[in-house]
Amino acid sequence: MKTTRKCRALLSVGLNLLALLFSTTAFITTYWCEGTQRVPKPNCSKDRRHNCIDYGVNETDPSKVHYSWETGDDRFLFRHFHTGIWYSCEENIHGGGEKCRSFIDLAPASERGVLWLSVVSEVLYIMLLVVGFSLMCLELFHSSNVIDGLKLNAFAAVFTVLSGLLGMVAHMMYTQVFQITVSLGPEDWRPHTWDYGWSFCMAWGSFTCCMAASVTTLNSYTKTVIEFRHKRKLFEQGLREEQTFLDPETFHYFRDRSVQSISSSVDVYPSHGSSHGNSRGKMRSPPAPVDQGDNTESLGEEQC
């Protein structure tokens, strides 16, 4: 039983650790959602000859009329972007690298409260995962008493379940805020196409591992309690079977006195024969006292 319980505890610790790593990685990265944004092409210059609009005339001459034969989507450039809880980064079309902006500032004013609530829920989710992981490790490595281990196991399961619920709420709130920002966000930011990224997948993978760890912990707690109840039932059954061989007075006598004092003064005859069934478990009364004078007279007669 001890080996099985330890294996279940190791599985719970491993799942909780995976959930903690996934959630922390998703929280600090900016790939929850990614896609493309449609922006007007910049004018061509000496440093930029591709993905730009070339009018073919001197742009600094105000007397010249500028014509462009590009129409439709040819007039636009599709740049890549990716967004997380904290920042939204897009490709810089005027140079190399990326340009990042705060996603909280991009969200509509009516949704910023929900976004902040999502951030707080994510932080609490990670903190409760840390607490649950610490309790599981404490139960696994520092608990020699089974009863103390059960208490730690129960608290770890409660904290893990609460963290999973908070994580689920946080992920759903962020998804709602992002979808509203896509429709009502700034014109220069609104995505043309978008999809969920690997950070979003890691966040929900963390939730899955968290709930699996909580279920495993609860299962370990339940199985241990059931095993203890079964052993206690067997012990009480064996105690009742032993009690049937003794009458109540003798049973209480044996329970109250030590074995040494009983063996020196009492003989117990648990007769199993059919003819001695009525005398089973009874104490033999001590022999009747013998007169000391009769003993001396008999000894004198024998000597004569």
Curated annotation (Swiss-Prot):
Name used for this protein in its record: Germ cell-specific gene 1-like protein
Gene that produces this protein: gsg1l
Polar residues: compositionally biased ranges: 266-278
Spans annotated as Disordered: 266-304
Annotated membrane topology: Multi-pass membrane protein
A GO cellular component annotation in the UniProt record: plasma membrane
UniProt cross-references to Pfam families, sorted A to Z: GSG-1
The UniProt record lists the keyword Magnesium: no
Predominant location: membrane
Quaternary structure (record): Component of the AMPAR complex.
Residues that span the membrane, as ranges: 9-29, 113-133, 154-174, 198-218
Family of the protein in this entry: Belongs to the GSG1 family.
Subcellular location: Cell membrane; Synapse
The protein's role, per its UniProt record: As a component of the AMPAR complex, modifies AMPA receptor (AMPAR) gating.
Topological domains, Cytoplasmic: 1-8, 134-153, 219-304
Keyword list, A-Z: Cell membrane, Membrane, Synapse, Transmembrane, Transmembrane helix
